[in-house]
């Protein structure tokens, strides 16, 4: 069915959900309200859309009810034994720690006292086992170092035993020789420095010998002989050194002998004689 389109506004029909009444009952057609005169062919603008419905507020949990004073008191009474037990455990731990510390200090003091007593006993036992007399502890070591003496004019050589670097202890110096006062092992040494303005064919001899009433003659301990030690017509110098260990007895006399007395340089750093007990 064709309807005229020349109407001031579109007609609005009420539509029922019933299948038997597709159209609204008579009188249910809404007419456009008059809004003043309009010209022919003009249409009325559509009505504005309805405002959006406000969103419901977000759901929030209901507030908790306040605790009653009776429940608070019950909670406090429940925690008091726990707190008391924790404090009691801490105090017991501190007491045990202090007891252990005191016990360890006591054991350490006893150990120190025992160690000191053992050391004193050990030292006393050593003194009993190895008694030493004051003479033995204060006894000087046997040693001697004699230097060249320019006043020496005879054989065996004379030595300086007092001045300069000379020293003597535990032995005696007598007429150019060292006299042994205590038997034992000794290191004996001697050095002689020869020099000359011209060369000759005579050999240089340097020896250390010993005298004792047990032997009929001199006993040579060390000796050196040197040949071809210089060149004819030239100044020359030669150093002779002897040293060895010997088992000497009481009253042994040690001497030094050389071949040419006039060729010796008697400086204390170049010509000397000595020994020391091992």
From Swiss-Prot:
Induction: By PMA/ionomycin and concanavalin/interleukin-2. GO terms for molecular function: cytokine activity; death receptor binding; tumor necrosis factor receptor binding. GO terms for cellular component: caveola; cell surface; cytoplasm; cytoplasmic vesicle lumen; external side of plasma membrane; extracellular exosome; extracellular space; lysosomal lumen. Disulfide bonds join 199-230. Residues 142-278 form the THD domain. Residues 1-77 are cytoplasmic. The keyword Secreted applies. It is a single-pass type II membrane protein. Keywords: Apoptosis, Cell membrane, Cytokine, Cytoplasmic vesicle, Disulfide bond, Glycoprotein, Lysosome, Membrane, Nucleus, Repressor, Secreted, Signal-anchor, Transcription, Transcription regulation, Transmembrane, Transmembrane helix, Ubl conjugation. Expressed in activated splenocytes and thymocytes. Moderate or weak expression found in small intestines, kidney and lung. CDD domains: TNF. Residues 125-135 have a biased composition (Polar residues). Residues 100-278 are extracellular. Residues 26-68, 125-147 are annotated as: Disordered. The chain crosses the membrane at residues 78-99. Residues 43-68 have a biased composition (Pro residues). It is found in: Cell membrane; Cytoplasmic vesicle lumen; Lysosome lumen. Residues 33-42 have a biased composition (Low complexity). The record marks 78-79, 126-127 as: Cleavage. Glycans are attached at residues 116, 247, 257. One of its GO terms (biological process) is response to growth factor. The soluble form derives from the membrane form by proteolytic processing. The membrane-bound form undergoes two successive intramembrane proteolytic cleavages. The first one is processed by ADAM10 producing an N-terminal fragment, which lacks the receptor-binding extracellular domain. This ADAM10-processed FasL (FasL APL) remnant form is still membrane anchored and further processed by SPPL2A that liberates the FasL intracellular domain (FasL ICD). FasL shedding by ADAM10 is a prerequisite for subsequent intramembrane cleavage by SPPL2A in T-cells. Phosphorylated by FGR on tyrosine residues; this is required for ubiquitination and subsequent internalization. Cytokine that binds to TNFRSF6/FAS, a receptor that transduces the apoptotic signal into cells. Involved in cytotoxic T-cell-mediated apoptosis, natural killer cell-mediated apoptosis and in T-cell development. Initiates fratricidal/suicidal activation-induced cell death (AICD) in antigen-activated T-cells contributing to the termination of immune responses. TNFRSF6/FAS-mediated apoptosis also has a role in the induction of peripheral tolerance. Binds to TNFRSF6B/DcR3, a decoy receptor that blocks apoptosis. Belongs to the tumor necrosis factor family. This is Tumor necrosis factor ligand superfamily member 6. It comes from Rattus norvegicus. The gene is Faslg.
